[in-house]
Swiss-Prot record:
Residues 1-137 are annotated as: Interaction with SOX13. Residues 194-270 are annotated as: Disordered. It comes from Homo sapiens (Human). This is Hematopoietically-expressed homeobox protein HHEX. Recognizes the DNA sequence 5'-ATTAA-3'. Transcriptional repressor. Activator of WNT-mediated transcription in conjunction with CTNNB1. Establishes anterior identity at two levels; acts early to enhance canonical WNT-signaling by repressing expression of TLE4, and acts later to inhibit NODAL-signaling by directly targeting NODAL. Inhibits EIF4E-mediated mRNA nuclear export. May play a role in hematopoietic differentiation. Residues 222-241 have a biased composition (Polar residues). SMART domains: HOX. It is found in: Nucleus; Nucleus, Nuclear body; Cytoplasm. Residues 137-196 bind DNA.
Length: 270
């Protein structure tokens, strides 16, 4: 089979079979291999003209542009070096060296800050806000439970002052420290005195009943506990003067209202 020799017009318009033809062809075509694009090797010399043969003209037109179809072909030879640098930066091994999605790494950093482990080894979320001492509120004050408050109020209605054995027994029953019971009674007496000053007539009967019940309870105690108590038989009289003596001798506590701070030994034990 004979192939006609392509003319100059056919060579200029001819389309290679393996790669698209550049829009602007240089005077001396340069093969676009990977080595040439990345600038790793010298440019291949222009093939020397040979005698016309049935396939020589077709081969001379196709061989300089025989390049893999997945490699991009530059539009203009003046941009070949710039495109080579861009390709090396985009498709090189160091082009994607950094993390594509830094958000999971940031979440992990925050997760370590939010997740902590308690002494038992269980993870807790937002532990700085959840791990708080029992009945502890802002300012270092203790918030008593409803049951504890009810029992303390019942005890205060019948007895305004507590002896050390009574304070110890009440603290053990309510699972509180003696210091907490002592301070609660101190604050409660301060509040009671303020109410008494505002309405002194309505509190006289309550004071007498409280004094009588306190004397009756102390007389029923064993002799050893009566020794530790600070009440005398002369103080168990319904007169107001004897009650003032009772308040001055039964306890060394002041009646100034103070904040109840948590007992560290009690909370650690609990």
């Amino acid at each position: 089979m004979q192939y006609p020799h392509p003319g100059p017009a056919a060579g200029a318009v001819g389309v290679p079979l393996y790669a698209p033809t550049p829009l602007l062809q240089p005077a001396h075509p340069t093969p676009f291999y990977i080595e040439d694009i990345l600038g790793r090797g010298p440019a291949a010399p222009t093939p020397a003209p040979t005698l016309p043969s049935p396939n020589s003209s077709f081969t001379s037109l196709v061989s300089p542009y025989r390049t893999p179809v997945y490699e991009p072909t530059p539009i203009h030879p003046a941009f070949s070096h710039h495109s080579a640098a861009a390709l090396a930066a985009a498709y090189g091994p160091g082009g994607f060296g950094g993390p594509l999605y830094p958000f999971p790494r940031t979440v992990n950093d925050y997760t370590h800050a939010l997740l902590r482990h308690d002494p038992l080894g269980k993870p807790l979320l937002w532990s700085p806000f959840l791990q708080r001492p029992l009945h502890k509120r802002k300012g270092g004050q203790v918030r008593f439970s409803n049951d504890q408050t009810i029992e303390l109020e019942k005890k205060f209605e019948t007895q305004k002052y507590l002896s050390p054995p009574e304070r110890k027994r009440l603290a053990k029953m309510l699972q509180l420290s003696e210091r907490q019971v002592k301070t609660w009674f101190q604050n409660r007496r301060a509040k009671w005195r303020r109410l008494k000053q505002e309405n002194p007539q309505s509190n006289k009967k309550e004071e007498l009943e409280s004094l009588d019940s306190s004397c009756d309870q102390r007389q029923d105690l064993p002799s050893e506990q009566n020794k530790g108590a600070s009440l005398d038989s002369s103080q168990c009289s319904p007169s107001p003067a004897s009650q003032e003596d009772l308040e001055s001798e039964i306890s060394e506590d002041s009646d100034q209202e103070v904040d109840i701070e948590g007992d560290k030994s009690y909370f650690n034990a609990g």
